[in-house]
């Protein structure tokens, strides 16, 4: 059922059949398609999917951003050639977009950590600028699930924040709480490169690992994320 909330109108029809079949049991209580299900026309199927889509809170859990698109003259109130904009959210019936604070992996030293932190803060600030200065009447940052429900009920779009790569934390564990305060609600410990917290999938080809899994501070980071309520992204 959860999968149905991110269906787009361009989804192939065979996928719509699969998603609806998985999402709703038939009258016998089984999720197996019945003869009546098979007889459903394409138009009926799309109508049923749209009914589900409009009934639930829909979300996209990963929308990459470029901070150049968060200025007074160029921003998400316009229909830019980007993954997500406010007009696209309106047209597509998308309620919640998770904007991503992404940082590519760099050297594991103080200079690398500080450059990564500056990059992350620039992206946090851009998201807050959109919601608090550029279009506060159209979108608001949610910090809790209750915020999401309230904002949607008020007729606005919802911004949430995910952090792709914990590299900007450096060795300063206080930054995890800083990122939580800024709205970060999920974070991956590494991304396409070994970080100070954990190994990455990039070591699988030649078995070149840095930590053998989590590092010692990786365990500490997980404990702190659990304390604060930050989901651990292991995708």
Report residues per predicted region.
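N-terminal secretory signal peptides that target proteins for export/translocation
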Residues: 1-6
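Active-site core of metal-dependent hydrolases
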Residues: 189-200, 204-235
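Bacterial N-terminal signal peptides
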Residues: 10-20
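Short, intrinsically disordered, low-complexity terminal segments
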Residues: 7, 18, 35-36
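N-terminal hydrophobic targeting/anchoring segments and the immediately downstream early-domain regions
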Residues: 22-208
């Amino acid at each position: 059922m959860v999968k149905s909330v991110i269906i787009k109108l361009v989804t192939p029809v065979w996928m719509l059949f699969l998603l609806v079949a998985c999402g709703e049991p038939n009258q016998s209580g089984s999720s197996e398609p019945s003869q009546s299900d098979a007889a459903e026309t394409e138009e009926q199927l799309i109508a049923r999917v749209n009914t589900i889509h409009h009934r639930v809170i829909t979300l996209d859990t990963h929308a990459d951003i470029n901070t150049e698109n968060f200025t007074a003259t160029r921003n998400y109130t316009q229909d830019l050639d980007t993954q997500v904009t406010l007009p696209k959210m309106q047209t597509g019936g998308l309620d919640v977009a998770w904007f991503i604070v992404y940082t590519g992996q760099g050297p594991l030293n103080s200079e690398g950590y500080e450059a990564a932190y500056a990059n992350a803060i620039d992206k946090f600030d851009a998201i807050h600028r959109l919601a608090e200065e550029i279009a506060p009447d159209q979108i608001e940052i949610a910090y809790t699930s209750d915020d999401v429900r309230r904002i949607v009920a008020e007729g606005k779009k919802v911004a949430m924040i995910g952090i792709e790569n914990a590299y900007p934390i450096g060795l300063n564990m206080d930054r995890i709480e800083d990122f939580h305060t800024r709205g970060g609600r999920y974070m991956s410990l590494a991304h396409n490169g070994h970080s100070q917290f954990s190994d990455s999938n990039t070591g699988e080809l030649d078995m070149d690992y840095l930590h053998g899994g989590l590092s010692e501070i990786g365990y500490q980071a997980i404990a702190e994320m659990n304390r604060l309520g930050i989901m651990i992204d292991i995708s």
